[in-house]
Design a protein with these regions (language model features):
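Serine-esterase "nucleophile elbow" of acetyl-processing enzymes
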Residues: 30-107, 111-114, 198-205
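Secretory targeting and sorting signals
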Residues: 1-27
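Short, well-ordered alpha-helix to beta-strand connector turns
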Residues: 14-15, 34, 80, 175-176
């Protein structure tokens, strides 16, 4: 990890055009160079919002992620590169080695004479988009129940689709040369921090930015960084020792999150004083990067060259 991983632990994705590819599976031999990449993590890896989504609907995987761009670049450099995106929006550290029940989809209705017929109809029409989940899919729960109203000749049933997907590391194996990863943001409540520090006020939906909640959230998240990163370190250790066993030069690249505020003051009322939310959130981001560097150093000591 040392050197390569340290260079690649940066903010953003500009590194795609600046850095050399990692060591391929067959370096400095007469064999063709190849690279097997698996991308794991949360929305920063799945590509939430980048369009061209595929896979389990709630995962919001895009074909335009930074990992996909890197794989395309590596192919252009003559390295035969395969790429799998198994990251999932909303994912957390535990999802790396554990199945995950995705959020329930919005409630809909289906007409049928019985609950068995309703379930069969949903499966036949792929009402839950289970086919899109492909080999990620473990199970589908329709959460079927009979609706109150009756149609003239049949019953109505309400269903709320919920898919359960496999652990992300199920797709990492001895053949994997490189794992790309972002993880930890959802555990630390980054969504709440953004809402409390910069969110608009929407009556009945969002309370808007609040200086006290922002300050307290930043402080609580900062104090939780060491424990959370230690958990992530443990998962990366498992990844290397239990999954990435085929290539002694295989690597894990942990990418830092971008700083979530601009480098200019953004003051919020905080009791009798004010709180600079922008500064607090940027300091939190820098603290997270320092903790990531700490566990990287420790992992490099445990797994030299990985």
């Amino acid at each position: 990890m040392r050197g390569l991983l340290r260079k690649w632990l940066i903010l953003g994705v500009a590194f795609l055009v600046l850095l050399p590819p990692p060591v391929p599976a067959h370096p400095d031999t007469g064999e063709s160079k190849s690279l097997s990449i698996v991308h794991l993590g949360d929305s920063y890896s799945s590509g939430n919002g980048l369009s061209n989504h595929h896979g389990p609907p709630s995962c919001l995987r895009s074909s335009n992620t930074w990992g996909s761009l890197f794989a395309s670049w590596a192919n252009s450099q003559g390295v035969a590169t395969s790429y799998q995106n198994r990251a999932c929006s909303g994912g957390n550290i535990d999802d790396l080695f554990s199945p995950r029940a995705l959020p329930q989809q919005s409630a809909k209705e289906v007409a049928a004479n019985s609950i068995e017929e309703a379930r069969a109809r949903l499966e036949e029409t792929d009402a839950c988009s289970a086919r899109a989940a492909g080999d990620d899919l473990l199970s589908v729960n329709h959460h079927l129940r009979e609706s109150d109203g009756l149609l003239l000749w049949t019953r109505k049933y309400t269903y709320e689709c919920q898919l359960t997907v496999r652990a992300q590391t199920d797709f990492v194996g001895p053949q994997t040369d490189l794992v790309l990863l972002t993880a930890g943001g959802n555990e630390l409540g980054f969504t709440d921090i953004i809402a409390n520090c910069f969110g608009p006020r929407i009556p009945g939906a969002l309370g808007g930015a609040n200086g006290t909640k922002c300050r307290e959230g930043v402080a609580a998240t900062t104090s939780g960084l060491p424990e959370m990163l230690d958990r992530l370190k443990s998962q990366i250790s498992r990844l290397i020792t239990e999954r990435m066993t085929g290539n002694p030069k295989s690597q894990v690249i942990l990418l830092a999150y971008p700083l979530l505020s601009l480098d200019r003051p953004y003051h919020l009322p905080d009791g009798a004083v004010s709180y600079d939310a922008a500064r607090g959130v940027r300091e939190l981001g820098r603290a997270a990067i320092r903790e990531q560097r700490r566990i990287i150093d420790e992992l490099e000591n445990d797994f030299p060259g990985r």
